[in-house]
Amino acid sequence: MLFPKDWDRVELDHPRYRAGYRFYYEGFDLFRFPDNARLLSFDARRYVDRLARKYRGRIDGVISNNEHFGALIAAALAQRLGLPGADPAVIIAAQHKYYARCLQSRIVPGATPRFEALPYDDGITAPPQLGFPCFVKPVKATYSVLARHVESFAQLRALMDFSPLEGLILRKLVQPFDDLMRLYTPFTIGARAMIAEEILDGVQVNIDGYVHNGVINVLGVVDEVMYPGTQAFMRF
């Protein structure tokens, strides 16, 4: 189990699991100090290499409920060890909001809003071609951080005007994803970018499910409930 949450440890300690399985926990808590200080020197490729050496021939599977790091690193480690798992390239395409929209626009163009990538390493120098208002968010983020409804170019520039410290934190947060993206895909737009999207109205839901051996299995349709007056998820 990579990058376990408290729920994972409690649930997997239940007798129904302990009776038949042995779990090994690896990773750190991205949202708790001092664990998250490890981001300053974290190298995802070396991390996968180390775990592959440590667990080769000792385990039957790699799992993670951690969206930010865990799912992708679990896929990379499973592939390295020859264990069942998702293709890392598929995880990357699903988690990178710009490339996910590119796939959606080819498969279901009528259900995909207009969108545009906005790299921020060199600052934002021109408004998005899709115009305003638009919804802007990082191509790789968590907990709706930096997601905003933007009405003007001035608001967009203010949103993307990061201090040196903020820029450092953002780079460290997405560097593991960028490193693995370059390793497993030909994608050229890294995670240090935002995506601007056409405004959508309506009920917001999650379609939960999975694909196994080419067969799509839908688990359910889940309501997304936001904190009042915000774009932050409160519960599902």
Which sequence ranges carry the predicted segments?
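Solvent-exposed alpha-helices and their adjacent loops that cap or buttress functional pockets
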Residues: 127-129, 139-142, 186-189, 199-202, ...
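Glycine-/Pro-rich loop/turn segments that contact NAD(P) or position catalytic residues
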Residues: 79, 91-110, 123
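Conserved ATP-binding module of the ATP-grasp superfamily
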Residues: 111-113, 153-201, 232
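Domain-scale recognition of functional cores that engage charged ligands
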Residues: 71, 144-146, 177-178, 190
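Conserved anion/nucleotide-ligand pocket segment
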Residues: 133-155
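ATP-dependent carboxylate/phosphate-activation module, predominantly the ATP-grasp catalytic core
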Residues: 154, 191, 198-236
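Short acidic-hydrophobic, aromatic-tinged amphipathic segments that line or gate anion-handling sites
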Residues: 114-120, 148-151
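ATP-binding N-terminal substructure of ATP-dependent carboxylate-amine bond-forming enzymes
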Residues: 1-90, 119-124
